[in-house]
Amino acid sequence: MAKKIVGYIKLQIPAGKANPSPPVGPALGQRGLNIMQFCKEFNAKTQGLEPGMPIPVVITAFADRTFTFITKTPPNTYFLMKAANIKKGSSTVGKAAAVGSVTMAQLREIAEQKKQDMNANDVDGAVRMLIGSARSMGLTVVEG
């Protein structure tokens, strides 16, 4: 028989930098999960990635205080800011000048990386989603 699921915990943790301090410790502690075991497993799984890259993780907590977790690809905004070489998006989207620009080739490359985590049927649909995200961050999309 399958284990009884107590709940799901969704967090965004920098790659290779999981530690028992907030937000990880309190979130896992509330469910009675082994915090250090999660930190070691997460850091081992993400050690090949760029340090500090934000990694969304979904932790499934079971009634016997065990857990499993799934890591996903970093958020679209992380890839868009990296492609445009900016630190943060525009605070006044549409009103002020654009804070940067991305090319269609860069968007297609990001869409290829994010394909399995995006809710799109094909790469073109994923590119259209990324165009919307880029515009809402104050980025201009140029051909190329």
UniProtKB/Swiss-Prot annotation:
Q: Which GO terms describe its cellular component?
A: cytosolic large ribosomal subunit
So which domain of life are we looking at? Bacteria
Pfam families reported in the protein's UniProt record: Ribosomal_L11, Ribosomal_L11_N
Q: Which GO terms describe its biological process?
A: translation
**SUPFAM superfamilies given in the database record:** Ribosomal L11/L12e N-terminal domain, Ribosomal protein L11, C-terminal domain
Q: Does the keyword rRNA-binding apply?
A: yes
Entry keyword set: Methylation, Ribonucleoprotein, Ribosomal protein, RNA-binding, rRNA-binding
Q: Which InterPro entries match?
A: Ribosomal_uL11 (IPR000911), Ribosomal_uL11_bac-typ (IPR006519), Ribosomal_uL11_C (IPR020783), Ribosomal_uL11_C_sf (IPR036769), Ribosomal_uL11_CS (IPR020785), Ribosomal_uL11_N (IPR020784), Ribosomal_uL11_N_sf (IPR036796)
* Post-translational events: One or more lysine residues are methylated.
- Output one GO MF annotation: large ribosomal subunit rRNA binding
What function is annotated for this protein?
A: Forms part of the ribosomal stalk which helps the ribosome interact with GTP-bound translation factors.
Report the family membership: Belongs to the universal ribosomal protein uL11 family.
Quaternary structure, from the entry: Part of the ribosomal stalk of the 50S ribosomal subunit. Interacts with L10 and the large rRNA to form the base of the stalk. L10 forms an elongated spine to which L12 dimers bind in a sequential fashion forming a multimeric L10(L12)X complex.
Which protein, by its recorded name, is this? Large ribosomal subunit protein uL11
Upper classification of the source organism reads:
Bacteria, Pseudomonadati, Pseudomonadota, Alphaproteobacteria, Acetobacterales
